Structure formats: structure tokens, C-alpha cells
């Protein structure tokens, strides 16, 4: 009978995590309850997905408030109702509008107005109710509403388990208003009676109004629905159908063959292309490739520079679509590391753009795929050690010198009366979400409206952003496109403009075959003169290039891999360098383990790359490439 449960996503108000809510609700004897956070739907998806694991059934909705003042509580009756709530909340958050005291017309939503702050009875619709708190029962008897039991439900706001929860809430409210705890108005805080009451306690309190118990139970039972968490919710298809997606993907891949390989069509390349297209068709990932292709095609039309990186470099199709500039056939990169039958979610393309161009790329995606179906991925900034000490110190009125001292030496706080409170509650609220922000690069492009799954808000970045993070998005079936920013790309663009201005030469930085053959480039690499080159300009990297005399692409790739912590700490980096510099050591290694050496001849039999794990598991363990990748992922 709890239709107004708050979690930590009632920002700077709620105290319990959703897991703690599940546990407390179950302990209190409830089977059904509703998660209705204040102006936030972040917990809704997880509540729908995980409640059954605790033996519970969860309804979801929103507690609509202007500041602390509750206007009404909405509970979704279906997926369509959740979308209505998300649309309503998003509109007000994006436009920074207060909520009216009267809810808009809904078709699939229950609305509960707090007793005493509701529209005239004659205006209440069949899905609208009046919510009564235990401390309002006496007021009911003195009003004309006593005869209208059909419209009464129990509105026991559930925010706390105990007094310590309430104290933490008071601190959060003071932090939110940037005021001293001693001066924070009581009317800007929740009541200490906003507890998770047990079923028996609620029945006892409302025993003289049995109809309200029946109405509340019925409302919750009629608000139960299932959401599909299994299928991919990304835009799919890209065209009108999956089959035409594949036809377009094949056509664009064949066009790319000429750009990448000239008039020749190497047999090995064609076999690899056929294999990849079959796997993409099988997993219905054609739309994912085509959206990335559309993005980089627009970038080229606008003269923007970009780099596709990550495991996407293992895909020949990505190379042919010019999403990446790495030839996976030349480097013997396995497509299975990027896509395989054991991976149901779309893979990640990490695409870097210049910081000057990224916003236009983002705007292009919103314009092309629709404002209602596109959103930036949200993320939560949480309370961490230093921020907690700072904020709690401020609400207790401590001078900044004391706050800094406690931040640097928490034990010193134990000898101060206020410091003890800070230590006590710092651990209590550590990890609580503080406020919503924007993921560094993620963009969601959905087949249906984003508000089927989440509300959105408008950060300073200027694009609608989801109220849930990437992990919840993935649980729902929404997988992000990564549009990143890399300042070095802007410098490359500027450099090429200067070259064209001074020398009249037009340089194609995506034509990597020419760069690989350039003798001056080779000399710069092996002499470690790589200042200004992304990733290979650090002192350690330049020293390594000099040691290896790396003057070709395979050596450069190896150098950029062995310097990573995992390889370098395991001793494989040192062994690779020794074998590279010492022919006798290479010969000895080949004699000792000829099969392993032959398998990884480019790295002298030393496991350097992620692909090497796949190779060894495949050739020595008898696993398929897809199974070997699953082993690699752990």
C-alpha cells in the first residue's frame, strides 16, 4: 500500500538505494509498491526489471513537485502510461517550467492529489484520486470528503527507515539550498513520519476507512505491467527494412573496395567481407554500421577530421565504409573480437572528432534521427570523500580552514564535535547521486521515442539528455554511439590547411598507405621525434620507439601495445624488446616453441595483443574464434 516510495534518485532528498527499498518493502510485509521519485524516473527501469528478484511487484511513476511542494503523484498503468509521464516531466524539465496544481489529461496514468491541495471534486476524472496521509485522517472527518471514500487512497510517503535516515535527509536538504543546517526551514524538509510503514501499521491507521485500503490496493494492482528488456531498442532498420539495410551495406562496402584496394579485389579480402556481412546479417547489426557510416560521411562532406578506433578496427566492413582507417586483413585482426554470435548487443565504434566539430556532428544526429528519438546519455555525479566533507562542513558552518584540514586528515575530525558528525554522515551518504550530468561521448538513437524508457532534461550542453546512465540504457536495450572529442584532430586540420596554402598540396590523411611508405615519417619514428603525435609523444613512448628503431607500421602498433600496464608489468614488454634486438634470442624462442612463434611471428612469439589470446585459444585449445573471444572477455 505504498504508492510514494522515494529512492536516492529523489536528488538531495531520498536516502535509500533501490536495493535498500526492495529489502525494506519486503521486510514491511508488502508485495506490491510504487517507486515514485521526485521529478525523476531514473529508478523506474531497474525497479521494473529487478523487483521480482526480491519477491516483489513494482509499479513506477513520478512524484511531481515544485521545490518541496507536492503537486500530485502519477503512477503508470502501462508502458504507454510511463511514456505519458516521461513526456510530461521532460517537457517541464527541458523548458524549466513549474508544474501546475492540476495534472494534464492522461489516458494510462493514475493521478493522486494530496489531500487539501486538489482540484474541486467535480473536476476529478475517473483515474484521479485524493491521497490521505495518516496525520490527515482527523481532518477528513471534519470535511465533506468523508462521504467520498471512492476517491480516497493512502498516500504514505516512504522516504526513511529511521531517525538517522531523516537526519541525513536534513543534511542533504541544507546542502541543496546551500544553507546552514541550523537555519534550514523545517517546512523545506520531509516529516520524520515519512517512514516505510508495515502493512499491519497501515491497516491499523486506516481501519476506520477500509475503502481507502481497497482503493490503494486496487490502484497498485492495476499499475503492474512488464517491459521488454530482451530486445535491441536502437534504431533498426536504418532504411525501410532489415533486408534493404543489408543491400545498402553491401553496396557501400563494395564502393569502399575501390578506395581501399584500387581495382584489384584480393581473394582474402572478398572472403573476409562475405564472412562479416553474413555475421552482421545474422545479428541484425546493419543499421548500427549504417548510422556510423552516415555520421562519418557527413563529417567528410563538411571537411571534418575524425578517427575511428577501438575494437571497431577489427572490422573490414568498417574499414571499407571509412569508419576506421585500419586494414584488419593486413594486420590479421579478428572480426570475432568486434562481433560474434555470443554478443547480442551492438559493438562499440569509438569515433573521435575535433573539439571544434563534435557539437555539429551531435546536432546532425539529432536533426537526422529526430529530437524525440535521440538523446545524450546521462550520468550521475556522486558524493565523494572531499565533496562530502566540503558540503557537510558548510552546512555545519565550519570555516574553510577546518574543512580543508578534515579533508586532508579525517582522523583530526574525531577530536571536533562537528567533525564527528561529519565523519558519521560522510560515510552514510558517500556514493549518493548528487546531480545529473552528461556522459563524455554517448548518444542514444532509438527506434521508438526515447520517452518510452526515460525522461530527459536539458543540460548546458544544449541537447536533451536521459535521466538514466549508460548501464541502465544497456539493460533496457539501448546501446550508445560514441562521439568523442580529440583536440589533436583540430591541429591536424589546421596543419593541412597551412600545407595547402603554402604548397598547394591537398593531403588525404585517411590514405594511410602513403603515410606508411613515407621515408621521412619512418626516420621520425625510429629517432623518437614524435612530439605532437597523439599517444606516441610521451617520454616513455619516444624512448621505446628509439629502442625498437620502429620505422614501420607493425612495429609502431606493437610499441603502442607493449607499453600498456598489463603487458609491461607481466614482463612481456621486456621480452619483446630483447627478442627484437637479439636475433639469437629469437632463434632460441622459435626452437623452444615453434608453433607459438609461428602463430605470433610479428611479435616473435610474445603475446602482446588481445587478438593473441584469441589466436592461442583457437589454435591450441580448439575453440572457435567466437568461443575464444568469449574466453578473452572472461
Indicate residue ranges for each PLM-predicted region.
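Extreme N-terminal starter segment of soluble prokaryotic enzymes
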Residues: 1-2
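Mg2+-dependent phosphoryl-transfer active-site scaffold
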Residues: 5-75, 79-256, 292-296, 305-308, ...
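Asp/Glu-centered strand-loop micro-motifs enriched in Gly/Pro and often flanked by an aromatic residue
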Residues: 8-12, 27, 263, 279-287
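A contiguous, well-structured pocket-lining segment that forms one wall/lid of small-molecule binding clefts
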Residues: 248-271
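Active-site flanking loop/helix segments enriched in acidic
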Residues: 263-264, 276-284, 595-601, 632
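Helix-rich "cap/lid" substructures immediately adjacent to catalytic or cofactor-binding pockets
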Residues: 266-307
